[in-house]
Amino acid sequence: MSARIRTALDQLVLRTANRLLGRLRRAKSGDDPYHRMFAQFRQMVLVAENPAVLEIGARNVSANHDGRDRFPGVSDYTGVDIHPGQYVDVVADAHQLGKAFPEKRFDFVYSISVFEHLMFPWKAAMEINEILKPGGHVFVATHPAWASHELPWDFWRYLHHSAHSLFNSVTGFEVVAVTEGLPARMFSLVRDPAAQYMHLFQMHQGIAIIAKKVSNYDRERLRWDLVPADVTDTLYPLPATKPAG
């Protein structure tokens, strides 16, 4: 059997399995805990008095909407991204937010599907702490399980306890809430004993975290001077140059 025919048959089997498993899918994910967590954060912003909000990863890549639309009535809203583009107010690296903004500039900082693309996410947590006001909040939505994307700048996946590894007393935070959502299953394509029952274990495609700044991060115990350019000559891909997959 030729490789081309085998590939076509494999695709047929996968499409058939996808249809058979369709009955396990929820009709909509709007009430999923992952989405409810952002609704909770959104309400925190909307009831605050004249909040200053920073969105990390504001460039219009696929959502085709302005993040400002999520927070009607918020006038002090800044969108930052590593590349210039639509809805981007400031071009800056999340690993170097302290160079782009003054200390204690924002009441709220949030990012959606960004932290998996940060080479040094612990450094980003330190930078967020620096530009947040005391008592300010950060919201992070990212993935415990997801297909690789925006290659080669796709580095990390996060589980429930990852929240505390990034946002803790040393980095100057306390975790207010964390939840995983968007349930999924994985089907192994190898017959290894350790993997053949992978489909029986539930995993999640989304994790949402809310953390509060309770202090400045511990500068005596924490220091990270490297930036991505120190260890790679690649850049986060633009749509025109993004590799397939």
State what each model feature region is.
Residues E49-H149, L159, H164, A211:
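Conserved SAM-binding loop
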Residues A3-V47:
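Class I SAM-dependent methyltransferase Rossmann-like catalytic core
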Residues M119-G245:
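S-adenosyl-L-methionine-dependent methyltransferase catalytic module, highlighting the catalytic core
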Residues K28, M44, V88, I112-F115, ...:
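Short N-terminal micro-motifs specific to bacterial/archaeal maturation
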Residues L14-K28, V53-R59, A147-H160, L235-Y236:
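Short N-terminal helix-initiation segments at or just after the protein's N-terminus
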Residues D31-H35, V90, W156:
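A conditional alpha-helix N-cap/helix-loop micro-motif detector
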Residues H35-M37, V91-A92, R191-D192:
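Short gly/ser/thr-rich secondary-structure transition/capping motifs
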